[in-house]
Curated annotation (Swiss-Prot):
GO terms for molecular function: RNA binding. The lineage of its organism: Eukaryota, Viridiplantae, Streptophyta, Embryophyta, Tracheophyta. One of its GO terms (cellular component) is chloroplast. The keyword Zinc does not apply. It is found in: Plastid, Chloroplast. GO terms for biological process: mRNA processing; RNA splicing; tRNA processing. Pfam families: Intron_maturas2, MatK_N. InterPro entries: Domain_X, Maturase_MatK, Maturase_MatK_N. This is Maturase K. It comes from the Eukaryota.
Length: 512
């Protein structure tokens, strides 16, 4: 227990002095420019995603945003004078996003500098695509999951108390004024739904309307939630262990642990609740969902569930609903992860064996990892996007009816290709073919609506080859990727293919 206390104390001692005093300096943009905030080789070279700005993040844009922040008189007047409060008026979204965006830019600077120094020590900066941690999940599913017995499907608990977010940053940041500024955002402007989404009094969920600040706060919160795993990994280093390592990126964090674990669960780090060993444990997370898979028994998974609930409750001082952790056996249940409905069913079979003149049957079982497209949630997502009704019947999309024919076909085709590309890892393609059919017929209905015709007459006039790319795009891509395949293509199309250029989940998948 003393080792755990010492580890947490040591990890939090590496605090960073924040750059808050520089917010009130006129030429902070020069400091930002010198440390890589310009467009040349910057970690922040991406769309600004600020209302009214279509440019990239640059030193000039950072200067303009920071200028808004150190106009304290303007902020005070806007709070006190409701008649002249531009935050409450039609510019509320613009100015609230500007302040939250620039705050996120500033707090990212010391963390990005730490990453740069870490990469410089290795004398070789890997390419950005090599940091995409989703690539490590696919081989884990294919190689490891079929050998495990139980899985805990975990939703990382939130909302959290606003003071918890501040305290998490306080463990690593020494600059008190910057923390006061963060409290100022939470308390004074809690009615900004685009900054943070109020759930209950003083409790907030994260909002994706401000992605920079959202990602920074969310990543800090998740790192604190998973800090115990880093401690366990270091304590178990003397045992046989293999790990894919820790990947840090601004969008998501991920860590997979494959080793023997000795778990200490304590109440507020004062007394030990239990001690147990797990012979084979895996932890995988992507975005706000994680799975904890084990080769152990169901009782062991219940201990892990109780451990997580107690850890979150004692460490973050809020009640974590046990219903957010589902324990399932692979042979009987499925679980959702990465937009797939995954399972490891047991397939019994009988093998005839013959020894001399005697023959007998040997019963055996095989386990195979399967992933399917969850058709019911996908139809719900397509229904929300107005591609079909709640029953899955395709409908026209009137919002796109005013576009040109080529634009309509391109948008439907791009949506179909993205979903087909993402769900190419499914082992059963029937649900994917149904989604393609819905999108194809929805496109035909939209074009027929535009030309004031029926779908039948429209398709007869254009021929049977119309919209054929909805079904042949994946086959064309495979023929280019694997031109020398030695077995029939129809068998290849039934196999799972994980594309490594999947760096984020499709918008429709986020509805699941």
């Amino acid at each position: 227990m003393e080792e755990l206390k010492g580890y947490l104390k040591k990890s939090r001692s590496k605090q960073q002095h924040f750059l808050y005093p520089l917010l009130f300096q006129e030429y902070i943009y020069a400091f930002a420019h010198d440390h890589g905030l310009n467009v040349n080789g910057s970690f922040f070279y991406e769309p600004a995603e600020i209302s009214g700005y279509d440019k990239k993040f640059s030193s000039l844009l950072v200067k303009r945003l920071i200028t808004r922040m150190y106009q304290q008189n303007y902020l005070i007047n806007s709070v006190n004078d409701s008649n002249q409060n531009r935050f409450v008026g039609h510019n509320k979204n613009l100015y609230s996003q500007m302040i939250s965006e620039v705050f996120a830019v500033i707090v990212e600077i010391p963390f990005s500098l730490r990453l740069v120094s870490f990469l410089a020590e290795k004398k070789e900066i890997p390419k950005s695509q090599n940091l995409r941690t989703i690539h490590s999940i696919f081989p884990f599913f294919e190689d490891k999951l079929s050998h495990l017995n139980c899985v805990s499907d975990i939703l990382i608990p939130y909302p959290v108390h606003l003071e918890i977010l501040v305290q998490i940053l306080q463990c690593r940041i020494q600059d008190v004024p910057s923390l006061h500024l963060l409290r100022f955002f939470f308390h004074e402007y809690h009615n900004w739904n685009n900054l943070i989404t109020p759930k209950k009094s003083n409790y907030y969920g994260f909002s994706k309307e401000n992605p920079r600040l959202f990602l920074f706060l969310y990543n800090s919160y998740v790192v604190e939630c998973e800090s115990i795993f880093v401690f366990l990994r270091k304590q178990s280093s003397y045992l046989r262990s293999t790990s894919s390592g820790t990947f840090l990126e601004r969008a998501h964090f991920y860590e997979k642990i494959e080793q023997h674990l000795v778990v200490l669960c304590c109440n507020d780090f004062q007394k030990t609740l239990w001690l147990f060993k797990d012979p084979f444990m895996h932890y995988v997370r992507y975005q706000g969902k994680s799975i904890l898979a084990s080769k152990g028994t169901h009782l062991l998974m219940k201990k892990w569930k109780s451990y997580f609930v107690n850890f979150w409750q004692c460490h973050f001082h809020f009640w974590s609903q046990p219903c957010r952790i589902h324990i399932n056996q692979f042979s009987k249940f499925s679980f959702y992860f990465l937009g797939y409905l995954s399972s490891v069913p047991i397939n019994p079979s009988a093998v005839k064996s013959q020894m001399l003149e005697n023959s007998f049957l040997v019963d055996t079982v095989t386990k195979k990892f399967e992933t399917i497209v969850p058709i019911i949630p996908m139809i719900g997502a397509l229904s929300k996007a107005k591609f079909c009704n709640v029953s899955g019947n395709p409908i026209s999309k009137p919002v796109w009816a005013d576009l040109s024919d080529s634009d309509i076909i391109d948008r439907f085709g791009r949506t179909c290709r993205n979903l087909s590309h993402y769900y190419s890892g499914s082992s059963k393609k029937q649900s994917l073919y149904r989604i393609k059919y819905i999108l194809r017929l929805s496109c035909a209905r939209t074009l027929a609506r535009k030309h004031k015709s029926t779908v039948r007459a429209f398709l007869q006039r254009l021929g049977s080859e119309f919209l054929e790319e909805f079904f042949t795009e994946e086959e064309k891509a495979l023929s280019l990727i694997l031109p020398r395949i030695s077995y029939p293509l129809d068998k290849l199309y039934r196999e799972r293919i994980w594309y490594l250029d999947i760096i984020r989940i499709n918008d429709l998948v986020n509805h699941l």
